[in-house]
Amino acid sequence: DTQALATQTLCQSSTPTNLTITVYGGIGTNSYQWYRNTTNSTTGGTLIAGATNATFTPPTATVGTQYYYCVVTQSSVGCNVTSAVSTVIIVAAPAITTQPASSSVCENGTPAILTVAYTNGTGTPTYQWFSNTTNSTIGGTAIAGATTASYSPPATTVGTLYYYCEITFSSGGCTSVL
């Protein structure tokens, strides 16, 4: 049989890689039942209602580590085989805790410094500030050299500009937050 993915680390509420079992040999029709466990073991797990296919999509809404395994039973002879354990680690999604504040400034005046802060990021963060002519975090233009948690926008152009910062993390399954 082909075992499910050994370990995956994911960001909370992200899309996981499906766990899939392929069984070779035997007689009759295979039936599948997936189990969840709080320990790295194929005994004592909790049956997952409705998880009766060769493929199972582990949930990612709750932070923590869960262990999954599948018991495959052949109907005609009553034999069964249990897969190896698949570990699914869900890490807390990063979130912006300090957003840049809006402000109005006269041309050639001194604008307020824009600052961002975050929680739950894993790894070394990198920052990239963007400007946009619309109030959106899509389609902005990366500002050259604006790669720290704070940015001092220029006040040399009349009109409205919107700024936002993308924080990217080097590891932990959670890559970025706006």
Segments and roles (model prediction):
Residues 14-24, 109-118:
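A short beta-strand segment in extracellular, disulfide-stabilized domains
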Residues 35-61, 131-155:
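Surface-exposed, flexible coil segments in extracellular/virion-facing regions
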Residues 1-7, 92-99:
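Proline-enriched interdomain boundary motifs that mark the N-terminal boundary
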Residues 86-92:
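Interdomain boundary/hinge segments at the C-termini of tandem beta-sandwich modules
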Residues 33-35, 67-73, 128-130, 162-168:
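Extracellular recognition modules
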Residues 24-36, 118-131:
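Solvent-exposed loop segments of extracellular immunoglobulin-like
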Residues 5-11, 101-106:
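Short beta-strand segments of immunoglobulin-like
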Residues 73-79, 168-176:
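Short, solvent-exposed loop/turn segments at the edges of extracellular beta-sandwich modules
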